[in-house]
């Protein structure tokens, strides 16, 4: 229950789904009395559920107010909480990803994932190496995201959230700049295969047409491609593990599908201010500093 309470508390927090009025004590009681099994159950709560939860909590704690004993039950707090839960259904992709409580995914990483991939339907099915295509996301964070999304239970929670009315209003096409690293060489480097450096990955990508060809290749073919014997043997041993070979093939397939979804780039010709910071100086005589 403690883990569930923390997950729901994070999910409802101001920078996540922003459910005003859902404090930790309410969450604890909702979990204790079985109203919540996971965060998606928030969107099934009714006014009667909240009132019953509070009544049971007060009886449990021996703290039934005199007004309640007299038959007067306050409901405005519950009305407000139901309204806050309903408002939270409309959210952004970055908030939703942050709210899920994925290990190592704070606000900035959630925003980066949203900005670069743009769509929950895409993100939730990507193999972990492709998350490394986002600037500042390294192997540890990418693996954590992949591990979370590989759990069937987490995917079911996402499904239930969407089924219960959560709407992500800012979906968009993936960033066309992703195309700069959607190739076999980058993928092989991102997979963190022992002894396969970016240089070796580029050699392999030049020698093999695609991931399927590499999976089927014997070690001597990798040596022919330019790899030292120890690197070739390490790669061959890595590929002998079916989980590794499957990850490579799934990642390559997802990479190709992602590349096909990229919009055309509109910034192929960089403008004169591309990548530069501009500072405007001078005065605005008619305005104060705050107005300017």
Task: Show the residue positions of the predicted features.
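Cys/His-rich short segments
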Residues: 1-19
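DNA strand-break repair and replication-stress modules
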Residues: 4, 11, 53-292
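Conserved strand-to-helix beginnings and helix N-cap segments that scaffold or border functional pockets
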Residues: 5, 24, 44, 289-290
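Conserved ATP-binding/catalytic motifs of P-loop helicase motor domains
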Residues: 17-25, 32-41
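Short, conserved phosphate-binding/catalytic loop or strand-edge motifs used
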Residues: 27, 45-50, 128
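Conserved phosphate-handling catalytic cores of large alpha/beta enzymes
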Residues: 42, 47, 57-58
């Amino acid at each position: 229950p403690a883990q569930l309470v923390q997950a729901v508390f994070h999910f409802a927090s101001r920078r996540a789904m922003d459910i005003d009025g859902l404090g930790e004590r309410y969450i604890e009681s909702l979990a204790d009395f079985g109203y919540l099994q996971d965060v998606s159950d928030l969107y099934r709560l009714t006014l009667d559920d909240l009132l019953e939860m509070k009544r049971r909590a007060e009886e449990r704690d021996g703290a039934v107010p005199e007004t309640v004993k007299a038959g007067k039950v306050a409901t405005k707090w519950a009305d407000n909480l139901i309204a806050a839960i309903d408002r939270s259904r409309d959210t952004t992709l970055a908030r939703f990803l942050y709210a899920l409580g994925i290990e190592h995914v704070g606000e900035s990483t959630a925003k980066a994932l949203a900005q670069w991939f743009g769509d929950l339907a895409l993100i939730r099915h990507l193999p972990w190496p492709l998350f490394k295509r986002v600037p500042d996301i390294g192997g540890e964070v990418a693996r954590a995201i992949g591990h979370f999304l590989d759990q069937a239970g987490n995917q079911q929670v996402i499904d239930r959230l969407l089924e219960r009315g959560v709407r992500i209003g800012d979906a968009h096409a993936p960033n066309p700049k992703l195309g700069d690293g959607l190739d076999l060489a980058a993928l092989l480097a991102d997979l963190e295969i022992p002894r396969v450096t970016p240089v070796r990955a580029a050699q392999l990508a030049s020698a093999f047409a695609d991931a399927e060809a590499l999976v089927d290749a014997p070690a001597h073919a990798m040596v022919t491609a330019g790899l030292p014997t120890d690197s070739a043997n390490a790669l061959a041993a890595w590929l002998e593990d079916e989980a590794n070979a499957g990850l490579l093939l799934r990642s390559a397939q997802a990479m190709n599908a992602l590349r096909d979804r990229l919009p055309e780039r509109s910034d192929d010709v960089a403008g004169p201010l591309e990548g530069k910071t501009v500072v405007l100086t001078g005065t605005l005589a008619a305005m104060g500093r705050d107005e300017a």
